[in-house]
Regions:
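Terminal (often C-terminal
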Residues: 1-13
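Extracellular jelly-roll beta-sandwich "head" domains, especially the C-terminal globular C1q domain
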Residues: 3-6, 25-35, 44-102
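A short, structured loop/turn motif at beta-sheet edges
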Residues: 11-13, 37-44
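Short, well-ordered beta-strand segments enriched in hydrophobic/aromatic residues
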Residues: 15-22
Length: 102
C-alpha cells in the first residue's frame, strides 16, 4: 500500500513494515494507515527511521493520532514532543518503521 510518495506499507501476517525512501514529512503527515494495520493498542514496538534535516540526522518515531473515524500519522523526531522539529515540508524520512499488530 502506498501511504505517500516514497512511502510504502507492507504487511506480512502480524508484522507491518513501512519503508521510507526520502518521503517528505508533509506528505507523510497526510497519509492514512489502513484500519486493519493499526497497532493495537497504538504502540509501536520497533523503530528504525531517520529524519534528514539538511545535513543533520535525527532518529525518530511515528505517532498515530485519532482524527474522527481515522488515524493520522505524524513523524516525531527523537523527542516526546511533536512540536520540537515539527513536520515541515523540507524534512525527509529515510529507513523503515516496523511494528506488530494484534
Amino acid at each position: 500500500v502506498t501511504l505517500a510518495e516514497n512511502c510504502i506499507l507492507k504487511r506480512c501476517g502480524k508484522h507491518i513494515i513501512i519503508s521510507f525512501t526520502g518521503c517528505i514529512c508533509l506528505d507523510w503527515k497526510k497519509a492514512n494507515i489502513p484500519e486493519k494495520c493499526f497497532p493495537q493498542p497504538n504502540v509501536i514496538n520497533e523503530r528504525n527511521t531517520v529524519l534528514l534535516v539538511g545535513a543533520s540526522y535525527h532518529l525518530g518515531f511515528v505517532m498515530l493520532e485519532p482524527d474522527g473515524h481515522r488515524y493520522v500519522v505524524y513523524y516525531v523526531p527523537d523527542t516526546n514532543r511533536s512540536g520540537d522539529l515539527g513536520n515541515n515540508s523540507e524534512y525527509k524520512i529515510h529507513g523503515e518503521l516496523a511494528y506488530f499488530i494484534d
